[in-house]
């Protein structure tokens, strides 16, 4: 079947998560590939409108036509094929989950002139779960161990793990395999085996067979049992997906509405706030941006967020309207009165959470309000006093510009941003008659971005 035209743009799609056992890698890839880490990253073009395939395009038809590796008839492939075919519902579910990622991954593989069979490895590795982690701490859809990730430029910090970032990890995985393929003289089966078990093991197996006068092709090498199954799994999947109708496997209909579009962030922003503006759940947003480990986007990781295409315009409009503007650390002007302010306790508040939110100490809160303990009641008023702690509030505050929208009130704006109405009035000269489009300056802490 001839594939219909597909525009393989740099657009990611993400489906639902799955759990399952993931294989343990013994990758021992060296740092030699670091120099190529950015070679293709800079070439990754994004379609900011979320466009990924031409009308009537069929992703699986395209991939099926590109699966061109020869598949020998042997017991190892036959065994893996039978295992997959005994659970056809799994094949449907995992390809549905894989579809979102496939647009970008297949595009990168095609651009690099690599075998399309490689896009099937994340099915073998992790069932396309970006949150998957093995016992050896291999992570992401490509199951990359920490040391290999570092060798290939994958940033791993407390707040961001590029091994779970689909773009970064795919770039690294393909860089690895390109390097390995050169090492093994263009033999892709040996390349895939080395990706799984490490180049050292494959080279040692080749050396052993040469010394014994045996063949050095993949099927003849004395490799670990996992690796002996790893390559056949990839080839079994290739045969099944290429001939899905013959095998009675129902592949999901591709749906471009699941495509993720990149939305730029000019500064760090709370994930809960982005989810609210985009109209999606926080859990889905975390899956779409699995590399981010904390609750803040655009801090340690990429300066953009991936959201479904159908939500991208809504998010861009919200960002542009000033619901959240670029945040820059700003000291409150010297002539701004900071003698005191009043905070109304909300349900769920604790003394420590209020202190953290406002940049003051719990001791100061107790002193200013003559509190003997830490017990609070919703609706209770707390005075935030002057002095050093008040100045710390100013020093730890951020200035944002909020553009008033239809239906807004001074009260709703203040509540949304966790500030006091009196402060909003103090920071802005004319708040008596708010109109849509009016701009307000607010001083808030980064961790006090609106969450509703």
From Swiss-Prot:
Task: Write down the Pfam families for this protein, in alphabetical order.
Answer: LysM, SLT
- Superkingdom of the source species: Bacteria
- Indicate the transmembrane segments per the record: none
Keywords from the named record: Cell membrane, Cell wall biogenesis/degradation, Lipoprotein, Lyase, Membrane, Palmitate, Repeat, Signal
Query: Its Gene Ontology biological processes?
Result: cell wall organization; peptidoglycan metabolic process
State the membrane topology.
Lipid-anchor
Q: Quote one Gene Ontology molecular function term.
A: peptidoglycan lytic transglycosylase activity
Q: Which family does it belong to?
A: Belongs to the transglycosylase Slt family.
Q: Which PANTHER family match?
A: LYSM DOMAIN-CONTAINING GPI-ANCHORED PROTEIN 2, MEMBRANE-BOUND LYTIC MUREIN TRANSGLYCOSYLASE D
About its domains, the entry says:
LysM domains are thought to be involved in peptidoglycan binding.
The molecule here is called Membrane-bound lytic murein transglycosylase D
Q: What organism, scientifically named, is this protein from?
A: Escherichia coli (strain K12)
């Amino acid at each position: 079947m001839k594939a219909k035209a597909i525009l393989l743009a740099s657009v990611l799609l993400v489906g639902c998560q799955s759990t399952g056992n993931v294989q343990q890698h013994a990758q021992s890839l060296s740092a030699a590939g670091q120099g190529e880490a950015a070679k293709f990253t800079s070439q990754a073009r994004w379609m900011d409108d979320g466009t990924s395939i031409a009308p009537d395009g069929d992703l699986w038809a395209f991939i099926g036509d590109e699966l061109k590796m020869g598949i020998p008839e042997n017991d190892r492939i036959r065994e893996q094929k039978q295992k997959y075919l005994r659970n056809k519902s799994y094949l449907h579910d995992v390809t549905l989950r894989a579809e979102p990622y496939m647009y970008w991954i297949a595009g990168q593989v095609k651009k690099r002139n690599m075998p399309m069979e490689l896009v099937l490895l994340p099915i073998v590795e992790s069932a396309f779960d970006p949150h998957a982690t093995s016992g050896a701490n291999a992570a992401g859809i490509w199951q990359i161990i920490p040391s290999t990730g570092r060798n290939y430029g994958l940033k791993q910090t407390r707040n961001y793990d590029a091994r779970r970032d689909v773009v970064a990890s795919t770039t690294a995985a393909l860089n690895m395999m390109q390097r390995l393929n050169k090492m093994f003289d263009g033999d892709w089966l040996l390349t895939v085996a080395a990706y799984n078990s490490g180049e050292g093991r494959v080279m040692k197996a080749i050396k052993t067979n040469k010394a014994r006068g045996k063949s050095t092709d993949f099927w003849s090498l004395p490799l670990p049992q996992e690796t002996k199954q790893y390559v056949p799994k990839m080839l079994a999947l290739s045969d099944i997906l290429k001939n899905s109708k013959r095998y009675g496997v129902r592949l999901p209909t591709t749906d471009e509405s699941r495509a993720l579009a990149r939305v730029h962030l000019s500064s760090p922003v709370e994930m809960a706030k982005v989810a609210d503006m985009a109209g999606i759940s926080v859990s889905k947003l975390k899956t779409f941006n699995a590399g981010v480990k904390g609750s803040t986007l655009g801090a340690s990781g990429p300066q953009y967020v991936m959201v479904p295409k159908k939500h991208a315009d809504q998010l861009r409009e919200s960002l542009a309207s000033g619901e959240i503007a670029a945040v820059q650390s700003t000291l409150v002007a010297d002539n701004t009165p900071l003698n005191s302010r009043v905070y109304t306790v909300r349900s769920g508040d604790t003394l420590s959470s209020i202190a953290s939110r406002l940049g003051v100490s719990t001791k100061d809160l107790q002193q200013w309000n003559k509190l003997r303990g830490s017990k609070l009641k919703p609706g209770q008023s707390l005075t935030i006093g002057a002095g050093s702690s008040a100045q710390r509030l100013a020093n730890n505050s951020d200035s944002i510009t909020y553009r008033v929208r239809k239906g807004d009130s001074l009260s709703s704006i203040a509540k949304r941003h966790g500030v006091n109405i009196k402060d909003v009035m103090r920071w802005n000269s004319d708040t008596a008659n708010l109109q849509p489009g009016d701009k307000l300056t607010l001083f808030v802490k980064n961790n006090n971005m609106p969450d509703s």
